[in-house]
């Protein structure tokens, strides 16, 4: 992500510091910062370490923004996807799949923020992706990482691909993408 960000217009601007580090342990050199942007992976982080560290290095008026969601928004395969998760999440994690609890966990960082606002966006135009690429992208998620699936990865891939092919046109899925942004200031805790 950092390489991509640097390659985009303005990515080498003097007022941008690119830091490659665990968020909880990033180096404190370079002075306070005005904006912190996090992605969906924030739910993997140790919030009790992360937010005090960010706050200690934030400039007055600092804003924290969290962008989450690259998910198909209400795709035609939603019901089948849910059934797939009900089967595979417990097989990998040992815990039952609970969509409401998962959603709550994905927002657990919010207790560390005084939220100014949040918005949900849905792409204007459908996104197209091959079935194979969609399946492959699932391995970027913690639950379905190759290290967690182990020797079950081929079965996972085959089952998900079979499910999705029913909804594909010439092996291409078409769906709109949902994204959410929330922003605020870090609380003194």
Question: What do the PLM-derived regions correspond to, one by one?
Answer:
Residues 44-57:
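A short, conserved alpha-helix within the catalytic core of class I
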Residues 35-39, 47:
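A short beta-strand submotif of the Rossmann-like class I SAM-dependent methyltransferase core
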Residues 18, 26, 44-45, 68, ...:
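Tryptophan-centric aromatic hotspots in well-structured domains and transmembrane helices
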Residues 1-27, 49:
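Class I SAM-dependent methyltransferase SAM/SAH-binding core
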Residues 56-128:
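Conserved catalytic/acceptor-binding region of the Class I
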Residues 14, 30-31, 175-177:
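Structured loop/turn residues at beta-strand edges in well-structured enzyme cores
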Residues 98, 102-189:
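Conserved Class I S-adenosyl-L-methionine
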Residues 24-36:
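A short acidic, Gly/Pro-enriched loop at the edge of an enzyme's catalytic core
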């Amino acid at each position: 992500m950092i390489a991509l960000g640097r390659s985009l217009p303005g990515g080498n601007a003097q007022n941008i510091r690119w830091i490659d580090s665990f968020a909880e342990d990033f180096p404190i050199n370079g002075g306070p910062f005005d904006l912190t942007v996090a992605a969906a992976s924030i739910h993997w982080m140790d919030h009790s370490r992360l937010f005090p560290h960010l706050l200690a290095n934030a400039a007055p008026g600092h804003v924290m923004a969290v962008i989450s969601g690259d998910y198909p928004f209400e795709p035609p395969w939603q019901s089948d996807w849910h059934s797939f998760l009900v089967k595979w999440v417990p097989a990998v994690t040992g815990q039952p799949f609970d969509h409401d609890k998962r959603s709550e966990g994905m927002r657990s960082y919010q207790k560390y923020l005084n939220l100014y606002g949040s918005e949900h966006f849905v792409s204007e135009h459908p996104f197209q992706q091959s079935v194979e690429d969609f399946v492959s992208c699932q391995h970027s998620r913690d639950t379905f990482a190759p290290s967690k699936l182990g020797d079950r990865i081929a079965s996972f891939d085959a089952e998900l691909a079979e499910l999705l092919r029913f909804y594909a046109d010439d092996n291409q899925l078409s769906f709109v993408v949902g994204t959410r942004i929330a922003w605020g200031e870090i609380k003194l805790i």
